[in-house]
């Protein structure tokens, strides 16, 4: 957004491998970390992961990695501290917690999850 105008800066691919026939099953949720340093995108279909990007000072993205999730990560939530990311996996019937490395943006499974039928959205109160 520059001078009250939305400006296209870059197109990125959120997953490296998308099997044939899955062209319409890409990212569901796209969110930025509270410190503005990383962008995350959930990839559905057979990829089932969270793509992680670093945001440069000029706003351009560079891919840092991907974190595997349960089936069909429909939504995710980054807590206010930026240290935790929760993923709602619709077809995995779960909400799973990941620890965020605030320097690299990479995620690590925190070993915490809850079973829920078909979760599709997460909100913080």
Label for each model-derived stretch:
Residues 35-37, 81-83:
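Short coil/turn segments that connect the beta-strands within blades of beta-propeller domains
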Residues 1-8, 52-60, 99-106:
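Short loop/turn segments immediately following beta-strands, especially the blade-tip
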Residues 28-29, 74, 120:
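Structural signature of WD-repeat beta-propeller blades
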């Amino acid at each position: 957004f520059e001078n009250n105008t939305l400006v296209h800066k870059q197109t990125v691919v959120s997953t490296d491998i998308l099997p044939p026939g899955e062209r319409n099953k890409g990212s569901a949720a796209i969110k930025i970390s509270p410190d503005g340093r990383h962008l995350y995108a959930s990839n559905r279909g057979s990829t089932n992961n969270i793509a992680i990007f670093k945001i440069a000072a000029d706003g351009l993205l560079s891919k840092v990695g991907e974190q595997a999730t349960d089936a069909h990560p429909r939504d995710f939530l980054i807590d206010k501290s930026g240290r935790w990311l929760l993923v709602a996996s619709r077809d995995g019937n779960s909400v799973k917690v990941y620890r965020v490395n605030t320097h690299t943006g990479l995620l690590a499974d925190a070993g915490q999850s809850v079973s829920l039928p078909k979760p599709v959205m997460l909100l913080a109160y």
